[in-house]
A protein has these predicted regions:
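Active-site flanking residues adjacent to catalytic metal/cofactor-binding acidic residues
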Residues: 214, 264, 327-329
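Conserved N-terminal glycine/acidic-rich loop preference
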Residues: 211-214, 238-248, 269-287
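Mid-to-C-terminal alpha-helical segments outside catalytic/metal-binding sites
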Residues: 2-50, 57-64, 68, 74-111, ...
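Active-site gating loops and adjacent loop-to-helix segments of metal-dependent hydrolytic enzymes
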Residues: 10-17, 71-95, 124-126, 131, ...
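Active-site gating/metal-coordination segments in enzymes
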Residues: 116-244
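Active-site environment of divalent metal-dependent phosphoester hydrolases
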Residues: 73-75, 120-122, 161-162, 190, ...
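Histidine-centered divalent metal-coordination motifs
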Residues: 69-71, 215, 265
């Protein structure tokens, strides 16, 4: 997303930094920072980190960032997506491992955690195909991790409507491939992630204290509603909100507290709707949410791909602390330059930039390297 001139928030040559604390952004944190303390350590994060000099060139950009939203799209997955009769939308962009590495190097990304994007591996109810495709994709991603030490991690794909196949693939992904987590979509047909049938899958993920990354999809309910506007332009953000709310209001967030969730695109529209969900919980008087939904929303993690404009960041940081925010690019649909520019325009403090770019991801994914 383009950042407007107004969103740059640049006054003369003075660096205007923000720091988000435990309860988000407030006016006390919007003042000018004096001295050079806010710049400490930013040079290692490259030209678009916090208040780093715009004179720095990409060639000097140290590789430090961890990208938790980075897609891999091998040719056999494209073939499956584009098979006749499938409602999978436009053909995905061209991709190769070399293209990923090139953008990572240009953007200062040390490690990208690979995941697949919509439409995933489940087409209709053909579990045999989804199992085969998941295994092929997970093996492909694991080979990239092995072939490029330190550069990639892996969120392995499963299809939760297939309980037996999912449990088998979870075991294979963690025990054989040593995957870093599991990647899910926001919905599967008419099932969102709070669906009762998914409980056995979550029991196993909770037992393993798994990291679960969730990517939006275009839901079956809402295709072609607005002429001339691709459904993903609206529905990706909305489907993320639906599934996050479903996880919380189903009781799964409380029932499975050891699953570490990461949601895409700054949580979609969720940060703008927390008041509505709080009132809903008060009206329902749900014993599973004695303190309302907000404490559960605040336990989750949110990455910034296509969610890094000033308005989006303001809303997100009123909902959660910076400790729950992670760096993501959505490559190859977007690139690292976009999110780097968004983070720089917001003028985070140096400490917050370090946390978003690397530190917060390492808390969940320590295998990816030293702090």
């Amino acid at each position: 997303m383009a950042i407007s001139d107004q969103g740059q928030r640049t006054l003369s040559n003075t660096c205007f930094c923000r720091s988000a604390g435990a309860t988000g952004v407030d006016s006390a944190r919007r003042g000018f920072l004096t001295g050079a303390a806010a710049l400490a350590g930013l040079s290692a994060l490259g030209p678009t980190a916090g208040c780093a000099s715009s004179a720095t060139t990409p060639a000097t950009l140290a590789r430090t960032r961890i990208d938790v939203h980075h897609h891999f799209i091998p040719p056999f997955h494209v073939d499956a997506m584009m098979a006749p009769g499938r409602r999978t939308g436009a053909r995905p962009p061209k991709w190769s491992p070399a293209m990923s590495l090139d953008d990572m190097d240009k953007s200062g990304i040390a490690t990208a955690v690979l995941s697949i994007a919509q439409p995933g591996v489940l087409f209709g109810s053909d579990f045999a195909e989804s199992r085969r495709l998941a295994r092929e994709l997970n093996d492909y991603g694991a080979k990239m991790v092995r072939d490029h030490p330190g550069r990639f991690g892996l969120f392995a794909v499963i299809a939760p409507p297939d309980t037996e196949g999912s449990l088998r693939e979870i075991a294979y992904a963690f025990d054989v491939l040593k995957a870093d987590g599991i990647g899910l979509l926001t919905s599967y047909g008419d099932k969102y992630l709070g669906d009762p049938s998914f409980a056995p899958v979550y029991e196993e993920l909770n037992r393993r204290k798994a990291v679960v990354y969730v990517h939006p999809t275009t839901p079956d309910c809402c295709r072609g509603l607005v002429p001339g506007i691709p459904p993903g332009s609206i529905e990706y953000a909305t489907d993320s909100t639906r599934t996050i709310a479903h996880i919380v209001f189903s009781g799964y967030a409380v029932r499975f507290p050891d699953i570490r969730w990461i949601f895409s695109h700054s949580g979609g529209t969720l940060p703008f709707l927390t008041g509505r969900f709080t009132r809903l919980a008060e009206e329902k008087k749900d014993p599973r949410l004695p303190d309302g939904p907000l404490p559960e929303f605040r336990k989750f993690h949110y990455e910034l791909a296509q969610g890094n404009t000033p308005g989006q960041l303001d809303a997100l940081l009123r909902m959660v602390s910076v400790s729950q925010v992670m760096y993501g690019t959505d490559y190859p649909f977007r690139d690292g330059a976009e999110v780097n520019a968004g983070i720089a325009a917001y003028r985070f403090s140096a400490a917050d930039v370090r946390a978003i770019a690397r530190g917060n991801a390492l808390r969940l994914l320590p295998r990816l390297g030293p702090a």
